[in-house]
Structure formats: C-alpha cells, structure tokens
Amino acid sequence: QIVIIDNLNNSSKEVLSRIEEITGTTPPFVQADLRDTDTVHEVFEKYSVTSVMHFAGHKAVGESVENPSMYYANNIGSTLSLIEAMQAAEIFTLIFSSSATVYSSTALSPFKEETEKDPINPYGMTKYLIEQRLTDLIKTHADWRIGLLRYFNPLGAHPTGRLGETSIGTPNNLMPYLMQVASGKLPKLKIFGDDYDTPDGTCIRDYIHVADLAKGHLAALQFLKGRTGAHAWNLGTGKGTSVLELVETVEEVIGYPINREITSRREGDVIEAIADPSKAYAE
C-alpha cells in the first residue's frame, strides 16, 4: 500500500481521482507539511510505513536564485523533519529525489556519480546539503538504506494522458511552459540566452521521461533490499537536447510554430548537463 503526504503547495487533490482512473484504487492521502514532524510520524505509525520516497520540495533554479531563503527553509527543513519522524518510527529505507544540479558547472558532461560537486544555484545547493546530511546518517546508524537519485530533466506524462505536470500558477520548467504557450494559455516562450558555447547557442539538457523516472525509483527500492549504506545513481538518458531542439521537435509534432523570444541568460543555469547513466543500468 502507498500513502501520500503533500501540502498541496504546487499540486492538486485532483491527482487522486486520476490515479483511481488509471489503477482502480485511490491511495490514502494526508494533507500536511513535512515540517510538521508529529503529523508525519503519526502517518507512519497509522499506516505501518516501511520505506519512504521523498519528492517534496521547491524545484526551480531561477526561483531559487530570486528567493534562496525559501529554498533553504523548505527543502532542507522538511528533510530534517522527515528524518526525525522516520527515526522515531524506526523506518530506515529512504529514496531521495536529488538533482543533477549538485554537479560542478565546470565539470564536463556526461556526469558520473563521482563527478565533482559544486552547485552554482541555491536549489542545487539544497540538494547537495541534503545528500551530505543523509550520508552522515550512515555514520551514526548502520541500519539506514538510502538511495540518492540524481534527476536530470524529467518531462512527459502518463501514457493515458491523465497524469502529467500541472503547476499551480506559471510553470517554472521548460516543457510545461512550452505546452502552455502551444495551447494559448501563455503568450510567449522566453529562451534564456542563445550565446552559449553549444551548436545552436542554447543550453543542453538530458531529458528523461517521467515514466522511466518512476521505474528508476522502484528499481532503487528493490536494490536497497538487504543492503545498507547510501547509494547514488544518475537518472538520465545519456543524450543531450538543446532548448531550441526541444522547441523545434514540439513544433514538428503540433504542426505550427511556437511564439518565442530570445532573452538574456538566466543566473544559475549551466551550459550543459548530460548523464552517464551506466551505473543505474548496471545495478
């Protein structure tokens, strides 16, 4: 059984009915903030939770540059609270949604798990510091089983089209923003810089389908059975796509041009981020 905890800061309870449409069941849902340690602990006890997948947190690079305090307070604070609740309930299996933003902007792609870590934006720094805290847990409690999943750039939706990324307000990620421009909900796509040292001048990212990302979580959970310690994996495809290439692909599929403009570079963006996913495939 799965139980969901979410404060609905950037999500909707409508997702629950969509899950029921697809699976035939509705998972138990508790509206709560992870920083409410007592409530989280109560949920763990009530549902006899044995493992946790920690997806919660703010997740936009640009927003983190504009409001770093919010990112540190929420992302790190919620994780520390979660750890406390898990320890109280004697739950020691955790899958953490980390990010490729932990890697150094000067490192060369593709990134291996051992690639130098040096985040250049507050969002990436919160992920890096959380990884460090989780790794420290192993030193004080040998029973912990931790998976650090470094996402590259997730996109896509469930094959039924009934579950996808629906942001509250203006999307912070490229693909949902692009689709809202395509559907007329937003007037124009801003591309942050076309003067990077890439073939077309725009940033290059490794885009992974959300369904493949979900499979990665289940595989990580299976891997941790019978194993202790902290284990990190890159979740990406190993292939890079530029912003313009993604836009042009969408235009080809929908059959009409996307209204777009080139603006100045955005602080906190790296030129290229491509995964070396060989460790994830091997394990």
Task: Pin down the residues of each PLM region.
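Pocket-edge positions in alpha/beta enzyme catalytic cores
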Residues: A32, F44, Y71, T166, ...
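N-terminal Rossmann-like NAD(P)+-binding domain of SDR-like oxidoreductases, especially those catalyzing
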Residues: Q1-A157
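C-terminal substrate-binding subdomain of Rossmann-fold SDR/epimerase-dehydratase oxidoreductases
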Residues: M175-E283
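Short-chain dehydrogenase/reductase
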Residues: Y72, I120-Y128, G164-P176, D206-Y207, ...
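A generic fold-level signal
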Residues: G24, E66, N74, H141-D143, ...
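Short alpha-helix boundary/capping motifs
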Residues: L34, V61, I76, N172, ...
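Catalytic core of nucleotidyl cyclases, primarily class III adenylyl/guanylyl cyclases
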Residues: T160-G161
